[in-house]
């Protein structure tokens, strides 16, 4: 988020940090990191340490604020209130059907207030009847947010702008 605020692409910064530096080889990239473990693990560690786990609490606040941050950045470039916006990928992690604590749903909830229309799709997720198929979403949307980094999204030929904080498309993560 800091890099983005200064107009820098964190994907490029991360690549430079990892270049010829094996200790940084597994440095994670940005994305809507979610799932049930961040809250659970933070609360367990805090409870073990007299509720003094500021790093964990702060990471949760940053993480939970990411959907609003991403939307705020998109609003600087696009008139969301006039657009059909899509979220491609609703699971909380790649190649999963698990939506527990998925920030893609928080992203959708906020976009419902900001955009003209909001569509969402994830062919892995079953039981959410609000989802449409991924091909239709790509065809119908004026702007797409990548909510989960499923590998199959790498091969999609998008015809509209894509907000891709996962760098699935390989074009960087600058919003």
What positions do the PLM features span?
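Structural/interface elements that position substrates and couple domains in central-metabolism enzymes
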Residues: 1-175
């Amino acid at each position: 988020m800091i890099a983005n605020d200064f107009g820098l692409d964190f994907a490029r910064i991360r690549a430079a940090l990892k270049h010829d530096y094996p200790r940084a080889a597994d440095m994670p990239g940005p994305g809507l990191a979610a799932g049930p473990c961040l809250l659970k693990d933070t609360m367990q560690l805090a409870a073990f340490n007299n509720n003094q786990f500021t790093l964990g609490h702060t990471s949760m606040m940053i993480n939970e604020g990411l959907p609003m941050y991403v939307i705020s950045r998109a609003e600087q470039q696009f008139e969301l209130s006039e657009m059909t916006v899509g979220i491609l990928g609703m699971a909380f992690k790649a190649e999963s059907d698990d939506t527990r604590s998925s920030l893609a749903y928080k992203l959708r909830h906020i976009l419902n207030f900001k955009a003209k229309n909001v569509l969402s799709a994830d062919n892995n997720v079953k039981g959410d009847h609000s989802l449409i198929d991924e091909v239709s979403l790509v065809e119908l949307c004026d702007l797409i947010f990548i909510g989960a980094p499923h590998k199959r999204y790498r091969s999609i030929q998008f015809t509209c702008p894509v907000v891709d904080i996962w760098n699935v498309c390989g074009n960087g993560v600058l919003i």
